[in-house]
Amino acid sequence: MSGNYYYPLDLSWSTEEISSVLHFLNKVELAYEKKVDAKQLLDSYKTYKTIVKSKAQEKQIDRDFQKVSGYSTYQVVKKAKAIEKGFFSLGN
């Protein structure tokens, strides 16, 4: 789903943290719109998890992002963990 939508960001995050979260969400978008390298996605997820530490917050961001974009961070990370390396796509 290409288009204009907002990213679920916490305004208490620093500029660097927001940049890291956006980097991860952009990788998720890439997994649906083209293809993404699993290792790069998992690296960005690792950084993302240093910012979004709680499972509850991670699930809320996934729900919010999926609601506005149609893309699931959970499904992308699950697929990346399953293949570990190489490119993959969840797009149609």
UniProtKB/Swiss-Prot annotation:
User: Record's superkingdom?
Assistant: Bacteria
Q: Which Pfam families match?
A: UPF0223
Q: Which HAMAP family does the protein's record reference?
A: UPF0223 (MF_01041)
- Sequence similarity: Belongs to the UPF0223 family.
Name this polypeptide is given: UPF0223 protein SPy_1248/M5005_Spy0958
- Which source organism? Streptococcus pyogenes serotype M1
